[in-house]
Structures are given as structure tokens and as C-alpha cells.
Amino acid sequence: MGIKATGKRTLKITLDHPIAAFNKLVTVPVFLPQDQKFVTKVGTSRYGTSASTTVSNGAFKVASWTGSNDTYLLKRNRYYWDQKAIHLKQIRYQTVKDANTAHNLFEDGKLDDATISGVTAKSLQHDTAVKHVDRAWTYYLQVNQRAGQPLENRKLRQALSLVINRQQLTKTVLADGSKPASSFVSPGTAVDPTTKRDFSAETSTSTKVNIAKAKRLWAAGLKETKVKGTVQLTLVGDDQDVTKNVAQFVQQQVQQHLSRVKVSTKNVPDKGLQNLKSDGQFGLSQWYWLADFADPVNYLGVLQSGNSMNSGRFSDKTYDDLLTKAKQTSSQKQYWQSLRQAANRLQNQMGIVPLYYVSETHLVTHKLAGVEYHAAGETDYTRAYFK
């Protein structure tokens, strides 16, 4: 990729090949331009590691941040071009690791917008301050499809998916506004401009529980793989309470409805989880994808062969070829057609087992307005104000 400034306000970018989602791609922060003189002055290794090594051209600038403190400020930038539209003098951010603590701080008037999850979110669903933000965020099971693993067999993967009651999972286990998943790409991520339909809706398949069909597929899969005795599956995940609750639910569903299978759960800190996954020491892994930008390719690309995020080692030439075609075409019609076909192929091959679409729960003071919540990307407080 070549980049050249051809004038004060014109940037020319030359690509090796067409990228249909280019305009969305460059909204990702890693592509935002930097002040070269300032970066050179502070050094590339130090740039962006504290308030003094960060430069801003937005409505606010970073202040009181050392790089490790839990509380810092965004102060109004008096050089911002649209000063008249900015109402807040500063924004105070506080990192709160515990949802119950966040709730208490909100109740004490020390937070105006608090993100909560887990048991806390579940218990506050009827609070008038609750706001659900549907994110471009899908929670799913990665399935170990390495050679010699029992779940390399597609029928066994399909059977697992068919016994999981996603309605029960979201309504009783999570009860935080999350919704059953029927596709890898979450609703609201993108509208297919060639069909005018939500991409998630047009590529969804039924994930309704079907125990009888699951048992037939499981029996056929066991016969094909020639597995003797009990299939031992280890379900790994991080050590958060919500992850443990989901793991126990999946474990119960699988063992209740399928024969000759034992699911062991293993919940470890995130670093340990990544090691287990990279070493292939799992049968199933609880994971999620939160889109960087609002386009289906951002999801589907992580499951191409060789992608570092593809811990289950799903590999399918048809799927790979469809995504490559989508990534290299300049035709919007071809782009969206290839993505639809790829999403359908992923579902058909059961490359992963989608569980639910995450709904982020916020506690927001009634006086706060003008905040923009996005499915993909960060919450925007630029033009926020208090009524």
C-alpha cells in the first residue's frame, strides 16, 4: 500500500488490489494518521504510553494518565475545529474491574455511564437506568478440528449444536439482554446493500433444539470416527463467573442428551487459556468475536485457514476461496455475494458453534444525553451533554 499527500487536505492511497470494505477498514484506530514530528520526538516505543507522550486532534485530549493508573481525564481540546458543538469540559474515565463495584459507584453518583455484566447485570434488568447496547459481538464455541480429534467429524459437531438450548441459555443463565445466535455475524453489524437486508438475518440458519436429529448425527459420527468407549471432551474458558456458568450449562446439555460423551470444564486465567488453545489442549473452547469495524468480513476472516485467531483449526478450501474472492474484488455485488456464500458455507460445515449475541448492559444517568453507542467501535461522548 502506498500513501501520498497530494495537497493540504488530500491523501492518495494506492492499493495492491481492490478492497471493497476499504472505507470501513480505515476507521479502525490503527489506521488513523499520526503527527510524525511528535512521534519522532517522543520515540515510537514511548508514543501513546502516557498523557505526555500522546497528541490529540479530536474534541478532547488525554490528561492525568501515566499509562497504568485506573483513573484519567479527557480534557476539552480548545483547538478542535467544531468547538461550538462540544458541551462537556472534561470526561473522567475510571477502570472498574468488578461489576458490583461499578453498580455501587453509579448509585453513589460517581459514575454517569457504567458498564456492568454477569450476575450484577442479570439482577438489574428492570432498573430504569439500564440501557442495552447490542454490539457486533458473538459468543461461540471453538471446536478442535485438528487431525485425530473426534470433533474433526462434522456430524459430531452438528449434533453438539443441536442439543444446546440457546433460548434457555440467554433467558435463564445469562438473563442480561443477550440473544440466541443463529449466525457467526451478529445482527446490526451491516446491511447488505445489494439485498437491503441485515447480513446476519440473511445468513442465519435454525439453531432450534432437535434432540432426535442430534442423536442420529451423533451415532453416525461415532461410527464414522470409529471411536470406542466414551468421547472425552475438555471445555476450556477463562475464569470469569459468566464463562463458568455458560460452561456448566453446555456441559449439562451435551451430557444429558448425547450418549458416550463426558465433558470436563477447565476455567483458567486468560493467559493460560491462550496457551491451552494454541497447544490444541481442548475439545471445545469458549470464545467471542467483537468486530473492529462494521463489516461481515471482519468476522469471517478470522476463520480462514492459518488465521491466528482460528484456534479450532477449521479449514475449508471452498470457504477460503470465497473469502479471498471477496477481499480482492472491486464489485460490491460480487463482494456481498461471496460473503453470503462464505457465511452459509461456515454454517453448513459447522466450523464453529454460535451460542449468543452479546448485549452490553449500561447503567446511564437520566440526565446524560447525546451519547452515540455503536455496534462496532467505541462509545462516542464527543457531543454528549447533561440535560
Give the ranges of each region predicted by the language model.
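Gly/Pro-rich hinge or "lid" segments in bacterial periplasmic/extracellular proteins
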Residues: 9, 15, 19-86, 90, ...
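Ligand-site clamp/hinge motif
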Residues: 77-123
